[in-house]
């Protein structure tokens, strides 16, 4: 029997009230790891050390495993402690009817996001910005302006305001609402100051509640052609606040950016198991959230980085598989261990840019330097590198890509425990003119030379 109607966030809410009861510990510690392990064995998944896959049969098995993971497990609602299940037809209905392209921004600054494929010769969209990193109120505008001034950058992804009017943006407080609005307004002003007033932005990042997220759609703030973020929870979980936010975005005809960062070494387990969950999470973004695009970001449980050998492999296989078997549009976010003004940070970001570009990502989003947790440690220079490397990578043979990545990751992977802290934005840039220091330009050139030595042609 066919499904009654296409699934949406309202159906999710209704099913979250009546679905099968389950404790969160049972979900996290039993259902997710056991099913991921079972599916890895069932489909004989073995990535054989490739960052970007060349085995289409193995990719097809991965897609089947990810689809089955979502179908059989469903999604756990953390508020009701119940499991929301979809039918197979509901999942296929969502996959078959995704947005195949959309526009971010307005006027001459608008960019068209459309499907890429594995080994595509076209450079992906570069979404430059702090990527949820904490940014001081007094430099919030110049930090974001440093990205808008970069021609390699197409859209902006917001940072988190550490304060507004000198007060912390406590969730569900008036200050959170003010911060969510101010975040968007200041970034729009930063883009205008850079001569790109129509640039699309992606957020909000400061707010942690539904009321904060919804309030960012305001006069002078986010508009429908900006990416509006909603986040899934690890792994295959969601709360009802997020479902309410989705309802607002849908009702406002907003571009919806569904975000989630699968954890390697966490509930899902190893490389293949985490990739199965990543594929399931991609698909869920379009069933549950009616997403325009999904923002990925496999992260290492120990190092807090998206640029490790393991997380790059997960990202490469998940994206290539999604790209090969669906029309889903996908991005990835960047969290290097090292801080700005260091070669390691730039090389880490480069490795991920190579992986994402070659595996068919539509959007690269970053860079949250110093793992995205240190205040003011992110600048436009890291996004420049992300973009330049993407341009150099597009169209290169996948066999060559895997060789370059193996050598590149080897240059920095022994330094995670002692990654260089780097410098703050205020130390990397002239804050008044929003231009990088001579020191940073020298560091940048050094990293670029190492990439050229590995075979990239800029």
Curated annotation (Swiss-Prot):
Instruction: Relate the assembly described in the record.
Output: Can form a complex with MtmC.
> GO: which molecular function terms?
monomethylamine methyltransferase activity
Q: Which reaction does it catalyse?
A: Co(I)-[methylamine-specific corrinoid protein] + methylamine + H(+) = methyl-Co(III)-[methylamine-specific corrinoid protein] + NH4(+)
Pfam families assigned: MtmB
SUPFAM superfamilies (UniProt xref): Monomethylamine methyltransferase MtmB
What EC number(s) has UniProt assigned to this enzyme? Answer: 2.1.1.248
Record organism: Methanosarcina acetivorans (strain ATCC 35395 / DSM 2834 / JCM 12185 / C2A)
Sum up the protein's function in the record's words.
Catalyzes the transfer of the methyl group from monomethylamine to the corrinoid cofactor of MtmC.
Q: Which keywords has UniProt assigned to this entry?
A: Methanogenesis, Methyltransferase, Pyrrolysine, Transferase
Q: Quick one: which gene encodes this? A: mtmB1
Q: What is this protein called?
A: Monomethylamine methyltransferase MtmB1
Q: What's its top-level EC category?
A: transferase
């Amino acid at each position: 029997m066919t499904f009654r109607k296409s699934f949406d966030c309202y159906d999710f809410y209704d099913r979250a009230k009546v679905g099968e009861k389950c404790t969160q510990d049972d979900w996290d510690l039993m259902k997710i790891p056991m099913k991921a392990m079972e599916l890895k064995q069932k489909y004989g998944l073995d990535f054989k050390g490739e960052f970007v896959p060349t085995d289409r049969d193995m990719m097809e098995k991965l897609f089947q495993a990810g689809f089955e993971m979502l179908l059989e497990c469903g999604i756990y609602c953390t508020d009701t402690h119940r499991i929301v299940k979809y039918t197979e037809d509901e999942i296929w209905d969502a996959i078959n009817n995704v947005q195949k392209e959309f526009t971010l921004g307005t006027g001459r600054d608008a960019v068209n996001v459309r499907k890429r494929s594995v080994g595509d010769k076209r450079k992906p969209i570069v979404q430059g910005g702090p990527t949820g990193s904490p940014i001081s109120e007094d430099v919030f505008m110049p930090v974001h302006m440093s990205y808008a001034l970069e021609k390699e950058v197409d859209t902006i992804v917001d940072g988190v305001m550490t304060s507004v009017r000198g007060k912390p943006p406590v969730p569900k407080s008036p200050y959170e609402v003010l911060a969510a609005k101010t975040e968007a307004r200041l970034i729009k002003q930063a883009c205008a100051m850079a001569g790109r007033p129509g640039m699309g932005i992606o957020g909000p990042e400061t707010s942690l509640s539904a009321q904060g997220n919804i309030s960012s759609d305001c006069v002078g703030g986010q508009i429908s052609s900006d990416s509006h973020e909603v986040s899934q929870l690890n792994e295959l979980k969601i709360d009802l606040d997020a479902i309410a936010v989705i309802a607002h975005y849908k009702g406002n005809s907003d571009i919806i950016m569904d975000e989630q960062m699968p954890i390697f070494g966490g509930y899902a387990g190893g490389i293949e198991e985490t990739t199965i969950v990543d594929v399931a999470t991609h698909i869920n973004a379009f069933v549950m959230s009616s997403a325009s695009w999904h923002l990925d970001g496999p992260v290492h449980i120990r190092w807090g980085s998206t640029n490790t050998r393991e997380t790059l492999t997960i990202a490469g296989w998940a994206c290539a598989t999604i790209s090969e078997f669906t029309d889903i549009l996908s991005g990835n976010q960047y969290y290097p261990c090292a801080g700005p003004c260091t070669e390691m940070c730039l090389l880490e970001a480069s490795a991920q840019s190579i992986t994402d570009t070659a595996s068919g990502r539509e959007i690269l989003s970053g860079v949250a330097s110093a793992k995205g947790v240190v205040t003011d440690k992110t600048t436009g220079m890291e996004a420049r590198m992300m973009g330049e490397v993407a341009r150099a990578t597009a169209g290169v043979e996948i066999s060559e890509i895997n060789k370059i990545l193996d050598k590149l990751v080897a240059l920095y992977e022994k330094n995670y425990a002692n990654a260089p802290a780097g410098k703050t934005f205020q130390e990397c840039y002239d804050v008044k003119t929003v231009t990088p220091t001579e020191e940073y330009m020298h560091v940048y050139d050094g990293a670029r030379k190492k990439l050229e030595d590995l075979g990239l042609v800029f």
